[in-house]
Amino acid sequence: MIPRHLAFPISAAVILFLPGSGSLYARQNGPQASDASTTWTAPDPATIPEGPLGDSIRLGLEVFNDTPKFAAPYVGNRMSCGHCHLKSGTAPYAIPVVGVPGLFPMYRDREKEVVTLEERIEQCFQRSESGHRLPNNSREMVGLVAYAQWLSKDQVTGRPFPGRGLAKLPELSGDANRGSHVYAQQCAVCHGPEGAGQPPSIPALWGPDAYSDGAGMNEIGKMAAFVQHNMPETNPGSLTPQQAYDVAAYVHSKPHQRFDIKEHK
């Protein structure tokens, strides 16, 4: 039996694997009609093999879902990978990690260099989890890569499928004042009136336990796309694009840890 904390949970709102300018597949892949040739079903955690490889995959899943607990030396807040890559990286339009190993090595404009999957994961720990780089041979890094590869085992490299990346929204201007009302009505019940969340299950949205200002989720457009399709968790997709932009602007206006690469080596 798979322990409960290894099951694919539905999380609440750190963008991890973010090639290109920010999100995993940016926002060019909005919701579309299902195509039998490109549909994908998440593998059952019960099928993770026994033995050393399976142990590494299971550790990677644990790190993914409760990063501060299972990768504590490398984390500087209370964010987990699964807070943005929902359902353990399997939820459509919640930046699923399936297929990610096949995208690397990749050239990234921000770094102006080709980076490996391990380097990209390190950047996520630095920016989204306000932490430090993991050694490539650490149990935690090997586990995360093993989990991503296992999750992608039935996905043809480079083949598109519905649900990748984030939902495509029109480009709008968010209003933090309007967003404060949306937040109070739709978000505060889970994330709290002061954005503190309920870690580890529900993430903080601002303050010392939330992502830094160097994280992908700190970009209003990306957060709006994530929120509109996935939140509130009890009624996802119920917010209009404008409401999503407004609440993203409100969260963006709140304090976040300042990201300085020199402090997160």
What are these regions (language model features)?
Residues 70-73, 88-94, 151-156, 198, ...:
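Secretory-pathway/luminal and periplasmic proteins that interact with or process carbohydrate-rich
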